[in-house]
Regions:
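Structured loop/turn residues at beta-strand edges in well-structured enzyme cores
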Residues: 1, 112, 175
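Short regulatory "switch" loops immediately downstream of catalytic or recognition motifs
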Residues: 13, 28-40, 46, 68-79, ...
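Broad gene-expression machinery/nucleic-acid interaction feature
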Residues: 29-31, 113, 146, 179
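Metal- or metallocofactor-binding catalytic centers and their adjacent structured scaffolds
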Residues: 39-125
Length: 182
């Protein structure tokens, strides 16, 4: 069992919206695919990850530092103790080799995007949704089905006036949200 390839692409976010800090039409997003030699339903298992909007894609960091470290590591060193799956913590440690400790933002985005794809692959190899895998590994096996969520909105669209913004916020409340982040 091993990671056979990690692909990354950085693309522009095609959105005309902005908030008080960020014009999303100028932002980029990184997408990552972690390919494995594990086959499920006749296809290789592939885990996917992406960085959130509001953060620039970090493809250069991934391609120059973090992806090579994972692919150059001994594949056996990235397997969990059962020998049946990848170990996200060992993969994270491989990515963090020769890095100064700390949570520098751009680096965190790069590592976090790959880490998301690794966890997706691990859950697929295990044959479980990620939320169940996490509940099994780090909880009592019973996922909490009640999760706090909020509506994110209030972005400035070209031509949007305060009336439309008010209508948008009201629509979130009408749909049952109790908290709106703008």
């Amino acid at each position: 069992m091993k990671i056979t390839e990690i692909r990354e692409i950085t693309i522009p976010i095609s959105s005309p919206i902005r908030n008080a800090y960020i014009d999303f039409s100028k932002m980029t997003l990184s997408l990552v695919a972690v390919m494995t030699d594990v086959v499920r339903d006749g296809n290789p298992v592939v885990g996917y990850g992406f960085n959130s909007n509001g953060r620039y894609g970090q493809g250069k960091l991934m391609r120059e530092r973090f992806i090579p470290r994972v692919l150059e590591a001994n594949p056996d060193s990235l397997i969990d103790d059962s020998g049946k799956n990848l170990d996200p913590h060992k993969i994270w440690n491989a990515m963090f080799t020769n890095e100064k400790p700390g949570g520098h933002g751009e680096r965190s985005v790069a590592i976090g995007t790959i880490d998301m794809a690794v966890w997706d692959a691990v859950a697929k190899i295990e044959g479980k949704p990620l939320f169940q895998l996490l509940a099994d590994r780090y909880g009592d096996g019973k996922p909490n089905r009640k999760i706090f969520v909020y509506a994110a909105g209030g972005y400035y669209y070209p031509g949007q006036d305060h009336g439309k913004l008010k209508d948008e916020m009201r629509s979130y409340i009408d749909r049952g949200y109790t908290v709106v982040k703008k």
